[in-house]
A protein has these predicted regions:
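Conserved GNAT-fold acetyl-CoA-binding loop/helix
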Residues: 32-60
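Conserved acetyl-CoA-binding loop-helix of GNAT-fold acetyltransferases
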Residues: 111-126, 148-152
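Conserved catalytic-core motifs of GNAT/GCN5-like acyltransferases
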Residues: 85-88, 93, 136-138, 151, ...
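Conserved GNAT acetyl-CoA-binding A-motif
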Residues: 126-139
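Acetyl-CoA-dependent GNAT
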Residues: 50-108, 119-120, 125, 180
C-alpha cells in the first residue's frame, strides 16, 4: 500500500460484526452518496451544493498524496456503513502536525456503532503516524451525537465560532474539538 499509517496498523480491522478497511476509488460513489445525503437533508455540513463523484475521486487522491488515511466501515455482510478520514488542517506548512477529522455515516447506519468504530480506527492511525500531533474536529454545534462521539475518545471542546453559516433558515455555530495524540 505504501502509506505509513498502514504499516503501523492492520490493513483490515474487524470490530463486532463490522469491517474497517482503507478506502479505494471503488468506494467513492457510496461515499459521495453519503456526503450528498448529509448536504441535502441535514445541517451537519455547511456545504449546500452536491458533490460529484469526479470531485470526490480527486479529493481521495489528495488524501493519499498527503499520506493520510481514509477508512470505510462495512457490516459483516458487506453493506457500506460510512467513511472517515483525517487530512492536514489548513496549510500544513503553517499548522505543523495538525489534522482535521471527517466522519460521515449512511443514514441507515447511524446509531449502530459505525461512528465509534471509524473514529477509534482513525485515532489509532493518528497515534501511529509520526507526522500527527493534534486532531481537530470541527462540528456543527447542534450535532450532539458527533460531539459526544468525539468526547468519548478524549477530544476536548476548545471553542465555538458562533453563527458562521446560514443554512435551512437558521444560523449555525461551529464547535472546535481537539485531541493531542
Amino acid at each position: 500500500v505504501g502509506r505509513r499509517f498502514f504499516l503501523a496498523m492492520p490493513t483490515i480491522v474487524i470490530l463486532a460484526a463490522m469491517l474497517i478497511r482503507p478506502a479505494g476509488l471503488a468506494d467513492v460513489p457510496a461515499m459521495t452518496d453519503t456526503l450528498n445525503w448529509a448536504i441535502e437533508h441535514t445541517d451537519v455540513i455547511f456545504r449546500a451544493s452536491p458533490a460529484s463523484i469526479a470531485e470526490r475521486e480527486d479529493y481521495l487522491r489528495h488524501i493519499w498524496k498527503e499520506d493520510c488515511p481514509c477508512l470505510i466501515a462495512e457490516s459483516d455482510s458487506g453493506d457500506y456503513l460510512g467513511w472517515a478520514l483525517y487530512d492536514p488542517y489548513r496549510d500544513p506548512r503553517v499548522w505543523t502536525g495538525c489534522y482535521e477529522t471527517t466522519i460521515y455515516l449512511s443514514p441507515t447506519a447511524q446509531g449502530q456503532g459505525a461512528g465509534t468504530a471509524l473514529l477509534g480506527a482513525l485515532v489509532d492511525a493518528a497515534r501511529a503516524d509520526d507526522k500527527v500531533h493534534s486532531l481537530l474536529a470541527l462540528i456543527v454545534s447542534t450535532n450532539v451525537a458527533s460531539l459526544k462521539l468525539h468526547e468519548k475518545f478524549g477530544f476536548e471542546n476548545v471553542g465555538t465560532l458562533k453563527e458562521v453559516c446560514y443554512k435551512f433558515d437558521h444560523w449555525l455555530s461551529l464547535t472546535h474539538l481537539q485531541l493531542l495524540v
